[in-house]
């Protein structure tokens, strides 16, 4: 079970001030359970782990196997919540050098539709020219510009290279049940498709086919991922006392820190494989809480790498920050520091020690230094990098996010602000229906 330690926040806030949130947290939990809070149309994630059927998982696994059998490369086309959850899990569990391994046990997973970089898309299409590839197109509407543009390119290339019949076999849609361009295309072309539930927003969708299908294609155990999430669903339930509920304590602590002037939360990891977990977390909390002119700004760093870039600012910059450190208790491999007769680097004092022991001491030393420098620290410990533990971590953050948003007084399940850039972009591109906006924006240029 993952654990949360908030002791290194005391001195900046008190244990009593965190405990004082108990009644507010209970009200937030009840609002989530009863569907009486803001954004109550998007609570399908709340009990998703415990409600996923074995039949549904079997269908996902079977489809994943078709892609695995027929593709050496699979492109996940999506943006934001439509790809970050899957990528977070896949990157956390994959060999760091899987690209370079001659014998691969699963298709190479590549991501598209998350940017509009012409060079990126050109280089991707060039790379795919001699590859047996498939596509998982993830979009509820099918009209999100970045993803729709990438899919248009990939669909044509797949059909041209592999033929219409094989393309039909290796293109899978994850989209709305009834409406939208992606649904129409899937039905017209005869693609296998999975449904994005209407009551689950993108950033909470990692345990729907949005995340589960790509994760299964990559060769990971989605049943164990779901089981881990279900375990945490129970541990963070509304019936669990405040003092024993990690999601409740995390939500309360970060809100109390925010109330005391800590406006920026930095998610820290000392494991490079967790980089995309941080990226997923940034979207989860940024879109959920950044509204109504308030909200904690979610930032992330990879230590010890970023200690050599951001470490100075964190140690001695403006004291508006707090850190939440994700620590992995047990690594998957063993590597000892060798002895060297010349000892020119002066590292023989580490000879015989595990590399992970050095990393753990860097973690502890950094935490103490940052606390001494005025940065409150929370610490989340996950037992290992496994499907079960990652499933626990994802649900922990989701549940805490729902509670935290209600404590903040915002709707954690909408994102009205993301439409502003789209409106301007469509006006600048002269999209039909945006004529008036186009005139107005041209006058500003």
From Swiss-Prot:
Keywords: Cytoplasm, Gluconeogenesis, Glycolysis, Isomerase
Pathway entry: Carbohydrate biosynthesis; gluconeogenesis; Carbohydrate degradation; glycolysis; D-glyceraldehyde 3-phosphate and glycerone phosphate from D-glucose: step 2/4
InterPro entries: G6P_Isomerase, Phosphoglucose_isomerase_CS, SIS_dom_sf, SIS_PGI_1, SIS_PGI_2
GO MF term set: carbohydrate derivative binding; glucose-6-phosphate isomerase activity; monosaccharide binding
Reaction equation(s) it catalyzes: alpha-D-glucose 6-phosphate = beta-D-fructose 6-phosphate
Pfam families xref list: PGI
PANTHER family per UniProt: GLUCOSE-6-PHOSPHATE ISOMERASE
Similarity remark: Belongs to the GPI family.
The protein, known as: Glucose-6-phosphate isomerase
């Amino acid at each position: 079970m993952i654990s949360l330690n908030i002791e290194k926040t005391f001195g900046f806030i008190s244990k009593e001030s965190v405990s004082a949130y108990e009644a507010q947290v209970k009200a937030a939990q009840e609002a989530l359970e009863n569907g009486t809070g803001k954004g109550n149309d998007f609570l399908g994630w709340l009990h998703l782990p415990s409600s996923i059927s074995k039949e549904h998982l079997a269908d996902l696994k079977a489809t994943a196997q078709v892609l695995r059998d027929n593709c050496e490369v699979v492109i996940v086309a999506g943006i934001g919540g439509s790809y970050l959850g899957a990528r977070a899990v896949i990157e956390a569990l994959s060999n760091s050098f899987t690209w370079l391994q001659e014998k691969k046990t699963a298709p190479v997973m590549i991501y598209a539709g998350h940017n509009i970089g012409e060079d990126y898309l050109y280089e991707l299409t060039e790379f795919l020219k001699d590859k047996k590839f498939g596509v998982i197109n993830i979009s509820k509407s099918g009209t999100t510009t970045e993803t729709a543009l990438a899919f248009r390119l990939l669909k044509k290339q797949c059909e041209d290279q592999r033929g219409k019949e094989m393309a039909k076999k290796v293109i899978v849609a994850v989209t709305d049940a009834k409406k939208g361009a992606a649904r129409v295309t899937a039905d017209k072309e005869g693609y296998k498709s999975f449904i994005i539930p209407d009551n689950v927003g993108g950033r909470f969708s990692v345990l729907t086919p949005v995340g589960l299908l790509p994760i299964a294609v990559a060769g990971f155990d989605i049943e164990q991922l779901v089981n881990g999430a279900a375990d945490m669903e129970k541990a963070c339930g509304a019936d669990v006392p405040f003092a024993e509920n990690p999601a409740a304590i995390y939500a309360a602590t970060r809100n109390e820190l925010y109330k005391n002037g800590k406006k920026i939360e930095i998610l820290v990891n000392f494991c490079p494989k967790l980089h995309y977990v941080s990226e997923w977390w940034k979207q989860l909390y940024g879109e959920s809480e950044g509204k109504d002119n308030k909200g904690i700004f979610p930032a992330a760093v990879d230590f010890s790498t970023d200690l050599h870039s951001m470490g100075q600012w964190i140690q001695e910059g403006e004291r508006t920050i707090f850190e939440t450190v994700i620590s992995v208790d047990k690594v998957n491999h063993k590597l000892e520091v060798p002895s060297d007769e010349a000892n020119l680097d002066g590292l023989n004092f580490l000879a015989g020690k595990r590399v992970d022991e050095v990393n753990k001491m860097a973690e502890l030393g950094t935490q103490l230094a940052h606390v001494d420098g005025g940065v409150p620290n929370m610490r989340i410990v996950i037992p290992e990098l496994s499907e079960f533990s990652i499933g626990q971590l994802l649900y922990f953050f989701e549940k805490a996010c729902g509670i935290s948003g209600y404590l903040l007084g915002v709707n954690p399940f909408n994102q009205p602000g993301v439409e502003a850039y789209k409106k301007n972009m469509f006006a600048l591109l002269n999209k039909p229906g945006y004529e008036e906006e186009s005139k107005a924006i041209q006058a500003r240029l």
